[in-house]
């Protein structure tokens, strides 16, 4: 059975655990119609356009 030869330090242990919990911000793109930021592959919440067409009526 595999056994560690040396004790893993708290720093090494914490760095290993922290690498799995990095915060990744979503990539934003600019809407080609109103130039506001929006999430990709979604209808623009400001103007209601998607893929060059008005999908929902914006107020």
From Swiss-Prot:
GO terms for molecular function: structural constituent of ribosome. SUPFAM superfamilies: Zn-binding ribosomal proteins (SSF57829). It comes from the Bacteria. NCBIfam families: rpmF_bact. InterPro entries: Ribosomal_bL32, Ribosomal_bL32_bact, Ribosomal_zn-bd. This is Large ribosomal subunit protein bL32. Keywords: Ribonucleoprotein, Ribosomal protein. Residues 1-21 are annotated as: Disordered. One of its GO terms (cellular component) is large ribosomal subunit. It comes from Alkaliphilus metalliredigens (strain QYMF). One of its GO terms (biological process) is translation. Residues 1-15 have a biased composition (Basic residues). Belongs to the bacterial ribosomal protein bL32 family. The lineage of its organism: Bacteria, Bacillati, Bacillota, Clostridia, Peptostreptococcales.
